[in-house]
């Protein structure tokens, strides 16, 4: 099973240097029923699925680096769920997110995995990609 995580340069640097990353955040206390995760959150899937998920994750996660990996022992990771905007439903209705009042966009629960601490010893990295989002150049002249 492949998992993915969008992360900052700083987080990636620590991970690649062999540090154990620790996050004790109980997301259910911060987001109520919108999340059952504790610690770091990971999406399920490969690079293609991660890039598709980016649409719902933008503004929530740091997108400096995309890491796709195979857990060495999936039992160390806890299944959880997070509630996000359901862009597939919006697209199927022929609408865009701006057609809904703020806070009333269609949402659904997505399966994820979480863990409170991990290091390179816990994962086999398959993909590390930087600059996931396109760079826009605006010419004001």
Positions of predicted regions on the chain:
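Active-site and NAD+-binding cores of ADP-ribose-processing enzymes
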Residues: 26, 62-141
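ADP-ribose/NAD+-binding catalytic cleft of ART/PARP-like enzymes
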Residues: 1-38, 55
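Amphipathic alpha-helical packing elements
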Residues: 37-42, 48
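Short, flexible beta-strand-to-coil junctions
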Residues: 6-12, 45, 61, 68-75
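Active-site-adjacent loop/helix micro-motif of nuclease/hydrolase catalytic cores
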Residues: 16, 51, 77-79
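Compositionally biased amphipathic helical and low-complexity segments enriched in hydrophobic
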Residues: 4, 16-17, 22, 55-58, ...
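Short active-site loop/helix that positions an aromatic residue
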Residues: 46-61
């Amino acid at each position: 099973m492949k998992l993915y995580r969008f992360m900052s340069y700083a987080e990636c640097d620590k991970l690649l240097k062999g540090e154990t990353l620790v996050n004790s955040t109980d997301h259910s206390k911060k987001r109520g029923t919108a999340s059952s995760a504790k610690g770091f959150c990971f999406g399920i899937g490969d690079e293609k699925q991660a890039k598709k998920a980016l649409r719902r994750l933008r503004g929530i996660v740091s997108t400096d680096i995309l890491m796709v990996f195979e857990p060495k022992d999936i039992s160390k990771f806890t299944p959880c769920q997070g509630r996000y905007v359901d862009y597939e439903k919006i697209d199927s209705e022929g609408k865009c997110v701006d057609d809904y009042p703020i806070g009333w966009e269609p949402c659904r629960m997505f399966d994820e995995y979480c863990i409170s601490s991990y290091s390179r010893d816990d994962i086999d990295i398959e993909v590390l990609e930087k600059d996931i989002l396109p760079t826009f150049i605006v010419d004001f002249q």
